[in-house]
């Protein structure tokens, strides 16, 4: 967002939903408008108010993505979807390397989970499978998709065959590039990185 600051003619609104909110919230920081809506039913009104030239959606697996895309299309607004971490492939590999005994929970575990919610792997797998289906439905209607990698491009070709693909070489935060460097000769071997995402295996 910092790169947009010198371009005062651009107006950017970042919107999200939070079901805990009773009413819409709004604010502005560094020239960017922020909107938090209680639910996706406020998307049409938001688009009418903001009058954007483009709707850019990050996160295609949740119902809000489909709702925003539908609201934008109803107002003849172009929609660009950013993909990263495609759910189809995340679901296919969610439990890679996890022993089968840990992937299937018995009735007792499901009963306990109702009282003390956690994340049973079979429930998580079922959830990922549903999200993958929702994402495929959203991307199946897409006309414009952006991604960073060859993986993203191949996923877009499979899931959004009618869409135009726009490569976007997004990068990591500057700290990633300016931190101390390691060299194999000095270190002895490459460091082992374990980069889980949240509570996923």
Show where each model-derived region lies.
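A short, charged, and often flexible helix/loop element on the N-terminal side
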Residues: 29-45, 57, 115-127
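Short hydrophobic "strand-cap" motifs at the C-terminus of beta-strands
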Residues: 148, 168, 194-198
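Short N-terminal targeting/anchoring amphipathic segment
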Residues: 46-63, 68, 78-80
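Helix-loop-beta element that forms the nucleotide-linked donor phosphate-binding surface
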Residues: 136-141, 146-147, 153-172, 179
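Membrane-proximal helix-turn-helix segments that form the acceptor-binding/catalytic region
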Residues: 87, 103-144, 158
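Conserved donor-binding/catalytic core segment of Leloir-type glycosyltransferases
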Residues: 184-201
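Active-site proximal beta-strand in glycosyltransferases
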Residues: 73-117, 146, 166-169
């Amino acid at each position: 967002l910092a790169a947009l600051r010198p371009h005062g003619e651009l107006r950017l609104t970042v919107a999200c939903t939070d079901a805990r909110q009773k009413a819409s919230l709004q604010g502005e920081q560094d020239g960017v408008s922020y909107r938090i809506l209680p639910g996706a039913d406020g998307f049409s009104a938001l688009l009418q108010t903001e009058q954007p030239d483009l709707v850019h959606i990050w996160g295609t697996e949740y119902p809000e993505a489909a709702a925003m895309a539908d609201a934008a299309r109803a107002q003849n607004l172009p929609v660009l979807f950013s993909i990263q971490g495609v759910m189809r492939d995340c679901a296919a590999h969610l439990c890679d390397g996890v022993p089968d005994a840990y992937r299937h929970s018995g009735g007792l575990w499901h009963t306990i989970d109702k009282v003390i919610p956690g994340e049973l792997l079979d429930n998580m797998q079922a959830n990922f499978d549903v999200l993958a289906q929702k994402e495929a439905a959203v991307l199946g209607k897409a006309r414009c998709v952006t991604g960073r990698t060859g993986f993203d491009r191949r996923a877009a070709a499979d899931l959004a065959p009618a869409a135009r693909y726009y490569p976007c070489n997004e990068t990591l935060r500057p700290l990633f590039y300016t931190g101390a460097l390691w060299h194999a000769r000095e270190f002895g071997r490459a460091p082992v990185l374990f980069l889980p995402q949240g509570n996923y295996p």
